Curated annotation (Swiss-Prot):
InterPro entries attached to this UniProt entry: DXP_reductoisomerase, DXP_reductoisomerase_C, DXP_reductoisomerase_N, DXPR_C, DXPR_C_sf, NAD(P)-bd_dom_sf
Keywords, sorted A to Z: Isoprene biosynthesis, Manganese, Metal-binding, NADP, Oxidoreductase
Cofactors demanded by this protein: Mg(2+); Mn(2+)
Organism, as annotated: Ruthia magnifica subsp. Calyptogena magnifica
Name the record gives this protein: 1-deoxy-D-xylulose 5-phosphate reductoisomerase
Length: 383
């Protein structure tokens, strides 16, 4: 029986994790659940799973939960509680599924405690990849990616890295793969949020539409698998059946295929090196549409090009790009800038920011805040 500390229990990754736990209550126990403000759903989860701890990051939400809960679950609040519980001696696995910079500290604390971290928090690698991966090595932590493309690479690399030539991340191409660039200016937020294959939140849907999401995954792969930028390739694959591939020097290519469902990835991270039932039915190749693959159009999808340039630049450039993208997408979703403005704003912010190399999470967070403020100033030129 493995004790799981689930950070971000009320989000989509959290819900999928719990659905896998439900199938294997003989193997996994929920030790801790965390959420930000959704105390109503947390109450339901506490009643069902009866964890030792429930953490509401928002203090007032924690107070509301503690006044109404009837189980023996201990209610905690604040980010420091997250940092403590991931390092608890009874925590075996940590599902790090808190979105954004808010999830970095607890993920790093889990690493420093030498836990198995099932990493769904992108920012830990995009913003603090050097810091994070050095800690993984130093504290002998076990890092397993919770992302369909990176999980695919992780699985394909189980045969070893000898003769590894390159990896290839697949991208759906988003809803505008076949839309002429001349029409990009008129794309609306609702159109950008209509992803063809995956059910996602609005921000990540826009990232998929600009292909920034794939650019961020390129940066994650660079750190996760200790690669050079030249060893990372992207191919557009609209069906999202092939999740990623690994190319070897002998001419062999290993790919991981499956239905687009995060439960497959999560169950693999939880059971590794074994495999367990995820609740997802197997792919039927005789009933699968024709698989298409295209080279990405860097002129149409400038954000992907920017991500490769940023990776080559290194230092705080990834922090700046991520911050500028988040602010630009927020303004786009609020109808304050158009779709084509997103990469322009990111590029301008990258040019304006001073280039440094952060050495701590505090420096990373500070750099992130400065980049966000600079992006807001740059956006004032638009509209």
């Amino acid at each position: 029986m493995k004790n799981i500390t689930l950070l971000g229990a009320t989000g989509s990754i959290g819900k999928s994790t719990l659905s896998v736990v439900d199938l294997h209550s003989d193997k996994f126990n929920i030790f801790t659940l965390s959420a930000n403000t959704n105390w109503q759903l947390m109450l339901e989860l506490c009643n069902k799973y009866q964890p030792n701890y429930a953490i509401m990051v928002d203090e007032s939400s924690a107070e509301k939960l503690s006044t109404i809960i009837t189980t023996d679950t201990q209610i905690l609040s604040g980010t420091q509680a997250l940092d403590k519980v991931v390092a608890h001696q009874d925590t075996d696995f940590v599902m790090a599924a808190i979105v954004g910079t808010a999830g970095m500290s607890s993920a790093l604390c889990a690493v420093k405690a030498g836990k198995r971290i099932m990493l769904a928090n992108k920012e830990s690698l995009i913003l603090a990849g050097d810091i994070f991966m050095k800690a993984v090595e130093e504290f002998n932590a076990e890092l397993i990616p919770v992302d369909s493309e990176h999980s695919a690479i992780f699985q394909c690399l189980q045969s070893g890295r000898s003769g590894l030539n390159k990896i290839q991340l697949t991208a759906s191409g988003g809803p505008f793969l076949h839309t002429p660039i001349s029409k990009f200016k008129y794309i609306t937020p609702n159109q950008a949020c209509a992803h063809p294959n995956w059910s996602m939140g609005r921000k990540i849907s826009v990232d998929s539409a600009t292909m920034m999401n794939k650019g961020l995954e390129v940066i994650e792969a660079y750190y996760l698998f200790s690669l050079t930028p030249e060893q990372i390739d992207v191919v557009v694959h609209p069906q999202s059946i092939v999740h990623s591939s690994v190319y070897y020097k002998d001419g062999s290519t290993l790919s991981q295929l499956g239905k687009p469902d995060m439960r497959t990835v999560i169950s693999y991270a939880m059971s590794y090196p074994q495999r367990i039932n995820s609740g997802v039915t197997a792919l039927d190749l005789t009933n699968t549409p024709a698989l298409e693959f295209y080279q990405p159009d860097f002129e149409k999808f400038t954000c992907l090009k920017l991500a490769f340039e940023t990776l080559n630049k290194g230092g705080n450039a990834m922090i700046t790009m991520n911050a500028a993208n988040e602010i630009a997408v927020e303004y786009f979703l609020n109808h304050q800038i158009n779709f084509l403005d997103i990469p322009k704003i990111i590029d301008q912010t990258l040019s304006a920011m001073k280039h440094t190399t952060p050495n701590s999470l505090e420096e990373v967070v500070n750099n992130d805040l400065v980049a966000r403020e600079m992006t807001r100033e740059i956006i004032k030129q638009y509209g």
